[in-house]
Amino acid sequence: MAAEGLAGLLPAQTQLEYALLDADTPQEKENLVYQYLKKMDSRERDLTVPELSRDLQWLNTEGPISLHKDLCGKVVVLDFFTYCCINCLHLLPDLHELEHQYSDKDGLVIIGVHSAKFPNEKVLDSIKSAVLRYNIVHPVVNDADATLWHELEVSCWPTLVILGPRGNMLFSLVGEGHKEKLFLFTSITLKFYKERGQIKDNSIGIKLYKDSLPPSPLLFPGKVTVDKSGERLVIADTGHHRILVTLKNGQILHTIGGPNSGRKDGRFSEAAFNSPQGVAIKNNVIYVADTENHLIRKIDLELEIVTTVAGIGIQGVDKEGGAKGEEQPISSPWDVVFGNSVSGTQEDDVLWIAMAGIHQVWALMLEGGKLPKGSDLKKGVCLRFAGSGNEENRNNAYPHKAGFAQPSGLSLASEEPWNCLFVADSESSTVRMISLKDGAVKHLVGGERDPLNLFAFGDVDGAGINAKLQHPLGITWDKKRKLLYVADSYNHKIKVVDPKMKNCATLAGTGEASNVVGSSFTQSTFNEPGGLCIEENGRLVYVADTNNHQIKVLDLETKILSMLPILNPETCDVTDNLSVQKDQIANLPKLPKSAPNIQLPSLSAAPGQTIQFLLKLTLPPDSKLNEEAPNAWFITAEDNNTWLLQGQCLSGEIKDVSCQTVIPFQLPRVCLSAEAVLAIKACLYYCSKDSSACMMKGISFNQPLQIGSTNQGRLTQVELTHSFITN
């Protein structure tokens, strides 16, 4: 093995790249690369990549891969990446396109070498979530100690290393934006070695982790916001590439886009997004940071139309802006929030944008107006407001001289004495503030004083730079209490910041990546929460618990944490009108008199607690469900307990008895009695398999509830099982 690592490639590859600058035609470029490969291949000694340890953990494969045995005869692209890095994410579309063009049968294999920056990124489950979230379909190895990184003397994320069929290093590409070279180098390398008979077409045993993922209502939700009334939520269902608008009980009102990624304006049924993140709602208009499309989208809930208001659909490199929105290239917008211009006459006439891809904060003028230290701007203009574009933790009285590092969350505090934007600056692990009087950028908590040190992270409660965060992605301002809540994503916590005292403390979460809805905030767990918002009245905080695929609810008054059930209106009828609910139940089939009535043990529960009833019914042998009949479950309560039913999902279809039917129920946050009884009923129609006889059967389960303060917020599951027998 050559000891010099990637440095051994530098002299020859530098000469090649200078020569490519002078080449006029594609043929000239191909010839130059071909001659370079002849030179590299005839070296007395290969620059050979070291073998990976067999103890390393792999994803998307049937087992560990040997670079020198399993990949002998392959052209290999090693992608040294860490999943927090926006530049690494920008590279993924190029790799997707490359592996679509060339498969392992063609002789090409891409290997992701995950070399973590943050401690949380060394954990295999965290990498699994990232592989799923970003649709990575090539093998990934968890090089948690960055052994290969150090052996090759890699210096930054991302770095690509192209290997020949002997594990011989041929090229390296540092940073993003080298698509043309990547495709040129790869295609000529494949051609060069195929001519020499050194390329093998064997399969390497890909086994995609995403194929084992069970379906869920949400997939890696990135952000959530709530309207001023507190009645509607907007959820960026990022992994499903869609936006959901729900009632506060989780009933879906609108599904916009999904389930596949795309880029299309139009009606809700045809619109398409690509990994949307930040959302902001005012009245019946929603703005969306359509992150991987590099767009800002506008959703009109009345017209049910999606339009593009900023971005051109490809990643921009412009760090100034100033063009009209739909003509202005932008880069990986991660969050959006409404604000006010200095001279505007309308409220919420500016949309602030966390432009993570170029480490800046931008503004989209929704009306004509003026920004701090700026000139008058026309409606529709999109431009940089703060940040030089250099990735750093630099505070400055002049907004254009300040530096951010992947700003990912924004929240507005418009009242005095704040009048600022709070920024969750993820890669510097800080919370910053931008004055809306003069644009000055100041530090609040986290990080350290050296603006170039982006490794000052940790999990420490404290004040100012003594507090430590780890890659915070979300932030929301509680104007009632004058406090700031932060999604400290890689610490799996929600933290609270007092901006007056610059103090930061843990509000919820243990620091363990898990999914426990515990008896208190600090006994509950999250898994990389990416966004959060607070009701206008300051009571409920909604958290996008990203890797748990859930929305969690923190009640700041009762200190109860619960999970928000996502209720699909196609399979579940929900209304706040009890008379309507009673009519719906009245129209459902009546259970036959022979239907058993099963008394369940009393269940201790707390206001706001979520209960999942897991219904599993078994038909007699040689019977089958009559799928044309109205097979259904429904929930009822005695007349003196009807307060339990308001806003609940009271009925739904039973389509398949081979698996459990999940029936969600959430106790009201205000309970009128300490004791109550729910009845969960089911009605099935089934026939003998020879269709000689069909029948209707029913079952009722009575669930007594003891409502108190025990098990506060805990998700409780109750199994309801019954086997029908032939009379």
From Swiss-Prot:
Annotated localization: Cytoplasm, Cytosol
Domain of life: Eukaryota
Thioredoxin domain boundaries: 43-198
Residue spans of the NHL repeats: 207-249, 260-302, 330-364, 404-434, 456-500, 513-557
Keywords: Cytoplasm, Repeat
Gene Ontology CC: cytosol
Pfam families recorded: NHL, Thioredoxin_8
Functional summary from the UniProt entry: Required for normal embryonic development.
Known partners and oligomeric status: Monomer.
Name this protein carries in UniProt: NHL repeat-containing protein 2
The species this protein was found in: Gallus gallus (Chicken)
